[in-house]
Amino acid sequence: MRNILKLIALNLFLLLSMASFAQDSNTFLIETNRGNITIEVYPKKAPKTVANFKKYVSNGFYNGLIFHRVISSFMIQGGGFDKNMMQKQTNDPIINESSNGLKNTAYTLAMARTNDPNSATSQFFINLIDNGFLNYTGKSSSKIGYCVFGSVIEGKDIVDKIGKFKTHTKNGQSDVPIKKVVIKSIKQR
């Protein structure tokens, strides 16, 4: 009996350790209907942005949303609209951490926002090329740039494929892919 209790306690400890490790992981799998993309995020460089992203992921927020904006030779953007181009309700905006030294180079992951530098919520984009004009160059709102918080480590071919999709205007939004790119899920690995 005592050995069984020890075995149960050991298994419980291992399960809790594995769950804790998964929560600390900085690697995520973005499953789409067009293929999978694996990303790595950088909490030491963009702690608030990564915490924000992890919160949305843990709540299943991105499941069923789409990459709603695709601009060839620029970027692909998702994380805010469903298949019917209805915007999903988000949490409050976060502070822009674009001064972290990370650059908007090809296959980096950055926060999308409005003209207000501190308006990013759930939407993100993947740079298809080096987009230096999106980098932080100063503290004024016209120079603050877009916060990079991760990069694609697998599935660059999928990113490139999505980046070449034909687009149209739908519900007042331009650059919407004609072929839907659905985020089935984003899972922490």
Where are these regions (language model features)?
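Bacterial N-terminal signal peptides
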Residues: 8-17
